[in-house]
Amino acid sequence: MDERFEIKDIVAREVIDSRGNPTVEVEVITKGNGYGSAIVPSGASTGTHEALELRDKEKRFGGKGVLMAVENVNSIIRPEILGYDARMQREIDTIMIELDGTPNKSRLGANAILAVSLAVAKAAAATAKIPLYKYLGGFNSYVMPVPMMNVINGGKHAGNDLDLQEFMIMPVGATSISEAVRMGSEVYHVLKNVILEKYGKNAVNVGDEGGFAPPLKTSREALDLLTESVKKAGYEDEVVFALDAAASEFYKDGYYYVEGKKLTREELLDYYKALVDEYPIVSIEDPFHEEDFEGFAMITKELDIQIVGDDLFVTNVERLRKGIEMKAANALLLKVNQIGTLSEAVDAAQLAFRNGYGVVVSHRSGETEDTTIADLSVALNSGQIKTGAPARGERTAKYNQLIRIEQELGLSKYAGRNFRCPF
């Protein structure tokens, strides 16, 4: 073993995320003075099958404190992995999974395990003196992802009457990530002015992910605002739309409650079909309830667009395998904190790619200044990244990191219209 990579110290602490809720930060230091730090995010609409964040459930922070998770890193995980070579990512992740011993990482907490997992990778990259994306992906990592920018919020992310959770723009006609960010930012500013004119200044406050939450009632109203803004910005041919329905949130007792109507699965499919016919929608995430593999298979067959599984798959290899067998969805939303280790997240991405599925590397609604997912999207050549509107520091941190990576790479390829299969 090259002793420069030996893990010399691990320190965990409680910090806060973009919603002011506590989360876990971990620092890993190697003997070669490689330093890696990671802060984990958390979601608002979470899948039932996600790995579990450990919360203290005491008075501090309204029960959301993470001191138990921090203590688990410092007193249980740390002694077990001190002295390990930081490049032994899979072995270290496996040790933590076995130490936890539960199927959903509920004993030590997925927030504790993931923070260590990511910090180890960063410390190894720093010791090797190479960027994280190159350390994780090697020299074949050169595809810059198309951003899915969540510019209008509904559902659990907003206080309006929109049932669908996210209305996103994708600058597929750009030629680079820096141009894509510029296009997205320009559309975002036009959208702000359009909303301001129609609904007044109270309608342009931003939500958790930097998007606006105007007082809208229907998806068509939101999509009309996007259409008008894209046209005014001059990007009709370059910018397309994506939706995150987060349908588990409006599903109850076998029915979907959308825009005041009680819909069956088939009626909801017709609703999506009509939207896709009317607007340039190229991707829909979680169109049905998280257990409705058949519904996902049906919409994937019926609509010639990207269908993304988030709550359906929760970045879990077993659930993804089931989806692949049933031809349910054709893309995976990759959230490292849904599964809890870097190794397992990469396994899920590789399984998706091998079976012709797209991969969208994603943030959470409760984010931090950590930029790991930007590097991960390039490392995997995922072709797509979902990291919010071009606003709020915890979102723009990822875009700025992608711009840095693009400049550093020199010869990179922007995924563009081939976002689902960039090769």
UniProtKB/Swiss-Prot annotation:
Active-site feature positions: 209 (proton donor), 335 (proton acceptor)
Entry binding sites for (2R)-2-phosphoglycerate: 165, 335, 364-365, 386
EC code: 4.2.1.11
Catalytic activity: (2R)-2-phosphoglycerate = phosphoenolpyruvate + H2O
UniProt keyword Disulfide bond, yes or no: no
Cofactor binding summary note: Binds a second Mg(2+) ion via substrate during catalysis.
SUPFAM superfamilies noted in UniProt: Enolase C-terminal domain-like (SSF51604), Enolase N-terminal domain-like (SSF54826)
GO molecular function: magnesium ion binding; phosphopyruvate hydratase activity
GO biological process, one term: glycolytic process
Cofactor requirement: Mg(2+)
Pathway where this protein functions: Carbohydrate degradation; glycolysis; pyruvate from D-glyceraldehyde 3-phosphate: step 4/5
Gene3D superfamilies reported for this sequence: Enolase-like C-terminal domain, Enolase-like, N-terminal domain
GO cellular component, one term: cell surface
Subunit structure comment from the entry: Homooctamer formed by a tetramer of dimers.
Stored NCBIfam families: eno
Function: Catalyzes the reversible conversion of 2-phosphoglycerate (2-PG) into phosphoenolpyruvate (PEP). It is essential for the degradation of carbohydrates via glycolysis.
Protein's recorded name: Enolase
Organism: Methanocaldococcus jannaschii (strain ATCC 43067 / DSM 2661 / JAL-1 / JCM 10045 / NBRC 100440) (Methanococcus jannaschii)
Lineage: Archaea, Methanobacteriati, Methanobacteriota, Methanomada group, Methanococci
Gene: eno
